[in-house]
């Protein structure tokens, strides 16, 4: 089994972990519909990316109404 050769001090451990923090993404406004979207991603509301429709978004239907 692998065992650490030497003890890692709190200082060295914390210095190594100093780069592990998560950074919140900066949402941008969709130029087509105005909703907030992640940069370099398809808009979830309208399906546009780079002023083109990439994904056809359909209206959500209620499953209870379809079953009845």
UniProtKB/Swiss-Prot annotation:
<protein>
    <recommendedName>
        <fullName>Large ribosomal subunit protein bL32</fullName>
    </recommendedName>
</protein>
<dbReference type="GO" id="GO:0006412">
    <property type="term" value="P:translation"/>
</dbReference>
<dbReference type="Pfam" id="PF01783">
    <property type="entry name" value="Ribosomal_L32p"/>
</dbReference>
<dbReference type="InterPro" id="IPR011332">
    <property type="entry name" value="Ribosomal_zn-bd"/>
</dbReference>
<keyword id="KW-0689">Ribosomal protein</keyword>
<dbReference type="GO" id="GO:0015934">
    <property type="term" value="C:large ribosomal subunit"/>
</dbReference>
<dbReference type="InterPro" id="IPR044957">
    <property type="entry name" value="Ribosomal_bL32_bact"/>
</dbReference>
<keyword id="KW-0687">Ribonucleoprotein</keyword>
<comment type="similarity">
    <text>Belongs to the bacterial ribosomal protein bL32 family.</text>
</comment>
<dbReference type="InterPro" id="IPR002677">
    <property type="entry name" value="Ribosomal_bL32"/>
</dbReference>
<dbReference type="GO" id="GO:0003735">
    <property type="term" value="F:structural constituent of ribosome"/>
</dbReference>
<feature type="region of interest" description="Disordered">
    <location>
        <begin position="1"/>
        <end position="20"/>
    </location>
</feature>
């Amino acid at each position: 089994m692998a065992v650490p050769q030497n003890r890692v001090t709190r200082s060295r451990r914390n210095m190594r972990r100093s780069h592990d923090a998560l950074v919140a993404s900066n949402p941008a406004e969709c130029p087509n519909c105005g909703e907030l979207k992640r940069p370099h991603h398809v808009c979830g509301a309208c399906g546009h990316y780079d002023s083109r429709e990439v994904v056809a978004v359909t209206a959500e239907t209620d499953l209870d109404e379809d079953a009845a």
